[in-house]
């Protein structure tokens, strides 16, 4: 994680360093990234970099945690919008994330490039979705699904996030239109609902 010195930087300087890092991590895998290119783009002295981060892996993890924070905020907002009902979450999350990504397309493309360049990396290092799911489970209103035991609830949430992610990726990979992908997501959610509520 960044040092206190990094957090004491003026926000524009911090953001410039992070944008330089994001751009570089989107260009090459973490192992191939050049700290020199990052510090040149950020216009900071090389010695300063090591006052902010232990190494480029430390910086890489911090960049990914920022994406985690965006994802978690979107999930929590969607959960609140759907009355904390888990079976309403996929469509609410789909709509919110789709709108956000359309408004922030350039940043989303950089994020997707970071994931593609680091495909061989442990998935747990890329995004903290399992931890986010556990936080969501604590906030969900399980009314009507009280009969599900803890493992079943976890499996249900995993399924719901999987189908939502698949629906979003179908749109961004241009396999389906946003309308068709949403329709299929609603259908899948309906099938899961019938199984979960029985």
Where are these regions (language model features)?
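Amphipathic alpha-helical segments used for helix-helix packing
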Residues: 89-124, 134-138, 162, 166-174
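Helix-turn-helix
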Residues: 16, 28-58, 62
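Alpha-helical DNA-contacting segments of helix-turn-helix folds
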Residues: 53, 60-74, 104, 108-111, ...
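Amphipathic alpha-helical packing segments from all-alpha helical-bundle domains
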Residues: 69, 118-158
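Basic, helix-initiating cap at the start of DNA-binding domains
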Residues: 1-28, 37
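Amphipathic alpha-helical segments that line or abut small-molecule/effector binding pockets
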Residues: 84-103, 158, 182, 186, ...
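C-terminal peripheral helix-coil segments that are non-catalytic and often amphipathic
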Residues: 139-142, 170-198
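Alpha-helical structural segments
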Residues: 12, 20-23, 27, 41, ...
